[in-house]
C-alpha cells in the first residue's frame, strides 16, 4: 500500500487566500498517514480490529523524501454502546456521549441508594454531594419556617 503526502489546506501569509498545497514538514514526529476505517479488516494478534492507521510499504513521496514508516498496524474497534434506535433520537456523537454519561451517573446513584456501593468508586463523592444537598434543603426549609413563623406572629402583635 503506498501513501502520498497528505495535502493540507493552509492560508498563504501574503494574500490571505486559501491554497491546497503540500505541507513540507518532513521532520515532524507525528506520522501524516490518515486513519482508515476498515470494517472487514482481520485483527492482528493481541488487538481488536477496526481502525487501521497506515503501516505500509516504504515508498518515496512526491519530492523524493521517504515517508515515516510504522512497524506495526494500529487496529482499534469501537463497538456501539447504544441500540440502533438511539441513532435517530441522538444524531450527534456529543448527544450520544452525554446520554451515556447521564446513564452512568444514574447507575452509580442507584448503586449508592440500594447499598451495592462497596465496589463503586464514586460512593464517597455521592455521599458528600447527598449530604451537601440535604444541608441546603434543610436550610431552605428552616428559612421558610422562620419566614412563616414571622408572618404568623406579625398580625398577632
UniProtKB/Swiss-Prot annotation:
Chain positions covered by the region annotation Disordered: 1-69
Superkingdom as given in the UniProt entry: Viruses
Family per similarity comment: Belongs to the herpesviridae TRM2 protein family.
Chief location: host cell
Alphabetical UniProt keywords: Host nucleus, Viral genome packaging, Viral release from host cell
Assembly and binders: Associates with TRM1 and TRM3 to form the tripartite terminase complex.
Location within or outside the cell: Host nucleus
The keyword Chaperone appears for this protein: no
Source species: Human cytomegalovirus (strain AD169)
Protein name, as recorded: Tripartite terminase subunit 2
Pfam family, one: Herpes_UL33
A Gene Ontology term for the protein's cellular component: host cell nucleus
Protein function: Component of the molecular motor that translocates viral genomic DNA in empty capsid during DNA packaging. Forms a tripartite terminase complex together with TRM1 and TRM3 in the host cytoplasm. Once the complex reaches the host nucleus, it interacts with the capsid portal vertex. This portal forms a ring in which genomic DNA is translocated into the capsid.
GO BP terms: viral DNA genome packaging
Segments of skewed composition (Acidic residues): 11-27
Stored InterPro entries: Herpes_TT2
Amino acid at each position: 500500500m503506498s501513501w502520498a503526502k497528505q495535502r493540507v489546506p493552509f492560508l498563504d501569509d501574503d494574500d490571505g487566500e486559501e491554497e491546497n498545497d503540500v505541507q513540507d514538514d518532513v521532520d515532524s514526529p507525528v506520522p501524516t498517514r490518515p486513519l482508515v476505517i476498515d470494517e472487514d479488516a482481520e485483527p492482528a494478534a493481541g488487538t481488536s480490529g477496526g481502525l487501521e492507521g497506515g503501516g505500509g510499504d516504504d515508498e518515496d513521496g512526491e519530492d523524493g523524501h521517504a515517508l515515516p514508516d510504522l512497524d506495526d498496524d494500529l487496529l482499534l474497534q469501537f463497538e456501539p454502546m447504544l441500540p440502533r434506535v438511539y441513532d435517530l433520537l441522538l444524531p450527534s456523537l456529543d448527544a450520544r456521549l452525554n446520554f451515556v454519561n447521564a446513564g452512568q451517573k444514574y447507575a452509580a446513584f442507584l448503586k449508592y441508594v440500594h447499598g451495592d456501593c462497596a465496589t463503586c468508586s464514586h460512593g464517597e463523592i455521592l455521599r458528600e454531594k447527598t449530604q451537601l444537598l440535604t444541608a441546603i434543603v434543610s436550610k431552605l426549609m428552616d428559612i421558610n419556617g422562620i419566614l412563616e413563623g414571622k408572618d404568623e406572629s406579625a398580625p398577632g402583635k
